[in-house]
Amino acid sequence: MATSKEMTAGPALPLILKFTLPLLLGNLLQQTYSLVDAAIVGKFLGINALASVGASTSVVFLILGFCNGCCGGFGIPVAQKFGARDYSTMRSYVAVSLKLAAGMSVVIALLTCILCEDILRIMRTPENIFEGAYAYLLVTFIGVPCTFFYNLLSSIIRALGDSKTPFWFLLFAAVLNIILDLFCILVLGWGVAGAAIATVFSQGLSAVLCYIYMYRKFEILQGTPKERRFQSKLAKTLLYIGVPMGLQFSITAIGSIMLQSANNALGTACVAAFTSAMRIKMFFICTFESLGIAMATYSGQNYGAGKPERIWLGIKASALMMMIYAAFTFLLLMVGAKYFALIFVDPSETEILLDTELFLHVSCMFFPMLGLLCILRYTIQGVGFTNLAMFSGVAEMIARILVSIYAVPAFGFIAVCYGDPMAWIAADLFLVPAFIYVYRRLKKQVFTNSQVTQTVA
């Protein structure tokens, strides 16, 4: 039987570290097959094909980010009820979230498929890569239900304190995706569409296996027919928490789309460099994302247990781990960025290699800002203040839009390199005072509840 784990007692640092490691390994796997995906496309299909995949990166983030944000939000009430040991309501939340996911994912898939071509036109996608970008994006949109369910099931399992099981399913998906990539591109000759098909199929199969495993192995999820019914009250709570988290990703992605659109106008070489650099950057920053996800579960459980003081201990522990890792990646990327770029393009592509190196050098200097962003935002979301956390996404969006409109036309690719760091700083300027406000409210709420309890007693 698979086991759940409470994070409401014991030293914060080892608890968070132990929970983060499987998440990190999973995210590294996810980014590894994203790297391999792009490397196979770049090496075997050429620079134009690589640019085709990269031209739609921010659009994919817009849609899938919304889905993933909703999934993370749906897991928060599960974590809170698990922390409060209200297992019946927890099971009802799980059942309702699955039904919501089914309806939402189908609607999103239909709308995005219809609008796919128009989206690429709006983004000023170069004509020489338009056909490949359209094929890749269309297949990705068709596979939205697979992605939605895979991420939701992983979120539910993590909410129960188990970050290991999602890792094993992600490992399966990563290995399968790489094998299918090679088969679809080299054997079947399906081009960039084959890369997207490989990803969608591997996620879909992993989602099915994850669902079967979850209900067979987690006895705590075995509920009654009443608990499996759709309950509108619980659905409203899930949407109230999940949709703002999804919108936060989407709002952030709007700024990324503006930035990528400005970069697309600089030509195919800049698009290819941006694609390579983003794949490498995402590989290294997934540690910050993993720490953030761990803090969402940690803070959610401790909020449910009425222990806000442990949330502050978790912030300090995760910040320490974040700074150590940020220093390590800074040294690694300052020395090795040019070698990582060679994964995607040949040494003869001098301009692309130099631009990729420049992008990574600029980004790694600001990684502590991103680490702080992830820790604070996920913590605020974990205690249920998802609407407040969403405004940090607005700050990111505004920063990227300003860079896209004013800086990129004036300074070119170097301005693109500073787009994300400026967004991280803008978000932190909002999140630091926001967290202070939330933490004070939680402490006051716990104090008030304890006074009421003493009065009743």
Functional labels for PLM-detected ranges:
Residues 1-20, 78-143, 187-243, 299-366, ...:
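Short alpha-helical transmembrane segments in multi-pass integral membrane proteins
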Residues 14-75, 79, 243-263:
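Signature of the first transmembrane helix
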Residues 18-34, 139, 150, 173, ...:
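Transmembrane helical elements of multi-pass membrane transporters/channels
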Residues 32-51, 120-127, 183-190, 250-279, ...:
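Helix-terminus/linker motif at the lipid-water interface of multi-pass membrane proteins
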Residues 41-61, 127-132, 192-193, 234-241, ...:
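Interfacial/gating helices of multi-pass transporter permease domains
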Residues 50-110, 147-166, 273-337, 370-392:
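Small-residue-rich hydrophobic transmembrane alpha-helices
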Residues 62-65, 109, 177-181, 207-211, ...:
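Hydrophobic transmembrane alpha-helices of multi-pass small-molecule transporters
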Residues 71, 139-158, 166-174, 195-210, ...:
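Short runs within selected transmembrane alpha-helices of multi-pass transporters and secretion channels
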